[in-house]
Amino acid sequence: MTMRRRLGAAVVAVALVGVVSGCSSSPSTAATVGNTAVAMESVDDAVEHCSKFINPSSELTPRQIIASTVIRGAVAQEVLDKRGAKLSDAERDQIVARNGMAALDSDQVCHTMVRSFAGVFHLFDLEGDRKAKADLSAVDVKANPRLGSW
């Protein structure tokens, strides 16, 4: 499976974990994850830099996949923070490489995005599917309607 397809498959799988509900209260906010605001600028930057890595045959647009990746990375971080768990950059980089996403390292914006998303893989590795899905779904997420339906 190509790196593009792995990223797309991972994002779609994680997007199915739970439905993002509600609306973000500010046009400059892509989502509110727990008490953390995810800036729309971070999604826009990631779309600009990382769309080239997304499989164009996907059922979701590159913007939807990338927005989901950015937001799910924040959701995973919220779960890790609640546990007091730390995941170093080196550990995140190992997860990225192990899951076939190292090509994203060629662009700093994409590298930052996928490093954040590595927290999702870490939770699945650490807890197993059922617990990780439950923990990720339990996080309160309000998405900006500009990002489409969730």
Which functions belong to the PLM regions below?
Residues 1-11:
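Bacterial N-terminal signal peptides that target proteins for export
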Residues 8, 51, 145-146:
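Bulky hydrophobic/aromatic packing residues
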Residues 12-16:
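Hydrophobic alpha-helical targeting segments used for export or membrane insertion
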Residues 18-22:
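C-terminal motif of bacterial Sec signal peptides marking the signal peptidase cleavage site
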Residues 25-114:
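N-terminal targeting/tethering segments
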Residues 33-34, 96-150:
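PPIase-associated folding chaperone regions across multiple families
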